[in-house]
Structures are given as C-alpha cells and as structure tokens.
Curated annotation (Swiss-Prot):
<dbReference type="GO" id="GO:0022625">
    <property type="term" value="C:cytosolic large ribosomal subunit"/>
</dbReference>
<keyword id="KW-0687">Ribonucleoprotein</keyword>
<dbReference type="InterPro" id="IPR037147">
    <property type="entry name" value="Ribosomal_bL28_sf"/>
</dbReference>
<dbReference type="GO" id="GO:0003735">
    <property type="term" value="F:structural constituent of ribosome"/>
</dbReference>
<dbReference type="InterPro" id="IPR034704">
    <property type="entry name" value="Ribosomal_bL28/bL31-like_sf"/>
</dbReference>
<keyword id="KW-0689">Ribosomal protein</keyword>
<dbReference type="InterPro" id="IPR026569">
    <property type="entry name" value="Ribosomal_bL28"/>
</dbReference>
<dbReference type="Pfam" id="PF00830">
    <property type="entry name" value="Ribosomal_L28"/>
</dbReference>
<dbReference type="InterPro" id="IPR001383">
    <property type="entry name" value="Ribosomal_bL28_bact-type"/>
</dbReference>
<protein>
    <recommendedName>
        <fullName>Large ribosomal subunit protein bL28</fullName>
    </recommendedName>
</protein>
<comment type="similarity">
    <text>Belongs to the bacterial ribosomal protein bL28 family.</text>
</comment>
<dbReference type="GO" id="GO:0006412">
    <property type="term" value="P:translation"/>
</dbReference>
C-alpha cells in the first residue's frame, strides 16, 4: 500500500529541517491519509478509499464522490478510482437514456 492519495494523487514530498544555525537535515513530508468510506449515489454502494484529508474536503465541496470523480482528471486518480469513475459515467449515461 503506497503512501499516496487515491483521488488527488498526493504523495510523499522530501525537504529539509532547517535549524536556527541553518543546519539542514533531510526529512519526508507525509500526506495526511485517512481510510474513508464514501457512498456513491449513482451506484447505490459504499466504497472504502485511502485518501488525504484535503481530498475529503474536496469531495464534500464538489457534492459527493460521483461529482468529484466525473470532474477529476484521470492522471491524478488511482487505477481503482479510474475504474469506479468509468462505472459511474456509464451508469449515469444509462439513467439519462432511460
């Protein structure tokens, strides 16, 4: 399991701790990942995802998992999230046709 957000693609970043004497030591900045269960209204199902706290706020801001995924760029999403996005878009198209 990698330290990357499944929805936004946020990963580990590297930098320095800088002391008062300007000594620099390498460190890692880890994303604030949470195991969250999100509900898809279109699919009538809940999905467990490992996403950053920032992604949780973004999902709520866009009005839920379905809206977030339909507007999200595929290159930021994990493979699992891309598959879910394709299923949601397909199901929305079926509902619109019916």
């Amino acid at each position: 399991m990698s330290r990357a957000c499944e929805l936004t693609g946020k990963t580990v970043q590297y930098g320095n701790n800088v002391s008062h004497a300007n000594n620099k030591t390498r460190r890692r900045f880890l994303p604030n990942l949470c195991n969250v269960t999100l509900i898809s209204e279109v699919m009538q199902q809940s999905y467990r995802l490992r996403i950053s706290a920032n992604a949780v706020r973004s999902v709520e801001h866009r009005g839920g998992l379905d809206n977030f995924l339909t507007k999200a760029d595929d290159k930021e999403l994990s493979q699992r999230a891309r598959l879910l996005k394709r299923q949601i878009v397909k199901k929305k198209a079926e509902q619109a046709a019916a």
